[in-house]
Design a protein with these regions (language model features):
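Ferredoxin-type iron-sulfur electron-transfer modules and their immediate structural context
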Residues: 1-156, 161, 169-389, 393-417
Length: 417
């Protein structure tokens, strides 16, 4: 028997009813060590870094309802940023001081062009956002010291995918940046609101990734590889939301495999797409002339090439040599321009598939999957194939133990084809 279920459906799950306690993030204590991120079994701690103005602009645009005051706040944001930078740097140097929300709202509430209602709306969203700058020198203080205004804000969002296992709190230890609290309706609403805000933000910019290079990860320093988890496409390489046990020891390994593969292979796919696009342009420009030249210099190779194109690409290949010849005769002579156009269509489709295809609804349109996974008799086969929540956003197959290696190799062959 063969069963099929949709990929990555776990991303839409809620584990609110499955946990009694949820980690609460205290940004003033966070050092951006990333230990909680890599240990979480449920991809429930998405994290990123941004410019302060990017965060404030997003908050104003989406949470302040009065249009005129929204515009006034937009115009005031550069001044707000400039007004609090020195205090932020001083606080970060001594690793204590006011929260970002307190600093921002202290300036905003003095603005006569902003009503109490609009200020409260901005304050309401900033209150629940995880905005860290005090003890994250790689994101804020080191950059700010080199160039005023360059320091960013680090955020760890607690997702509703969390099962409340507490592994992140254990890893955080005495830092107390993550502490387990009772999961009330009010707190659950806060973490959902915060993660919805996160979806409005752009991805982490390269300048906040340190010695990790997002475009050429192979050139990154090994110690900086933890930062690849700050890039959304890498962190979301496994979606979770499945029925694995709370505190599962297998899923952090799966997440590491999937995220590192995504980090390495996605730029490779995009570079391949760019090469194909360049070849496509050259073929459109010179292809017909080159074919004419080939026909003059080597008629046999010219005929073989056109026959291969008509056979493999244009669908004229039959079950036998005789059948193929009949199809060719019925179709008629294929012009050089038709043969070149057929190859161009293949290159165009391949370039699109490698760079712009949206393989799953609701996910980035950045190309087809860079990996597949075969499971055979184990925990992964159970929580991965239990509807409705599948954690795998790539081709995933579950089979009996004796078939797993063979079928997985077949999946691998499909990537090579």
């Amino acid at each position: 028997a063969v069963g099929v279920m949709a990929s990555a459906t776990g991303a839409t799950a809620s584990k609110y009813g499955a946990r009694r306690e949820t980690p609460k993030y205290f940004p003033e204590n966070c050092t951006q060590c990333m230990e909680c991120i890599t240990s979480c079994p449920d991809t429930a701690l998405p994290n990123m870094a941004h410019d302060l103005q990017t965060i404030l602009q997003t908050a104003v645009d989406n949470y302040v309802t009065d249009e005129s005051e929204r515009e006034a706040l937009r115009n005031a944001l550069p001044d707000v940023d400039a007004a609090i930078r020195e205090t932020m740097a001083t606080n970060a140097k001594k690793k204590e001081g006011e929260s970002l929300r307190e600093l921002v709202m202290g300036i905003v509430r003095q603005d006569e062009n902003v009503s109490q209602e609009s200020a409260d709306q901005l304050d309401g969203i900033l209150e629940i956002l995880p905005l860290s700058y005090l003890k994250v020198p790689a994101i804020f203080f080191s950059l700010e010291r080199k160039e005023k205004g360059a320091g960013g804000i680090f955020s760890i969002f607690v997702s509703d995918l969390c099962k409340g296992c507490g592994l992140c709190v254990e890893e955080c230890g005495d830092h107390n940046a993550l502490v387990m609290v009772e999961d009330t309706e009010e707190y659950n609403a806060e973490i959902i609101s915060a993660t919805e805000f996160m979806k409005l933000l752009p991805d982490t910019d390269q300048r906040f990734l340190g010695k990790y290079n997002n475009e050429t990860p192979e050139d990154s320093r090994p110690a900086a590889w933890r930062n690849h988890m700050m890039v959304n496409r890498n962190y979301d390489a496994l979606t979770s939301g499945d029925g694995a046990c709370a505190g599962c020891g297998e899923k952090p390994v799966l997440h590491s495999i999937a995220s590192v593969t995504e980090a390495y292979m996605r730029p490779v796919y995009h570079k391949k797409a760019d090469r194909l696009t360049q070849k496509l342009a050259l073929l459109k420009q010179d292809g017909v002339n080159l074919l004419e030249k080939l026909a003059e210099e080597d008629p046999k190779s010219y005929g073989t090439w056109k026959r291969i194109v008509s056979h493999v690409v244009m669908g004229l290949g039959g079950d036998s040599t005789e059948d193929t010849q009949i199809r060719h005769d019925e179709h008629g002579e294929i012009s050089d321009s038709e043969a070149i156009e057929a190859i161009c269509l293949v290159l165009e489709r391949e370039a699109f598939n490698h760079k712009n295809l949206q393989s799953l609804d609701g996910r980035l349109a950045n190309g087809m999957s860079v990996m597949a996974m075969g499971a055979h008799t184990g925990c992964n086969t159970v929580y991965g194939s239990t509807p409705p929540n599948n954690p795998h956003p790539y081709p995933w197959l579950n089979s009996l133990f004796q078939d797993g290696a063979t079928i997985s190799w077949m999946m691998g062959e499909s990537f090579m084809a």
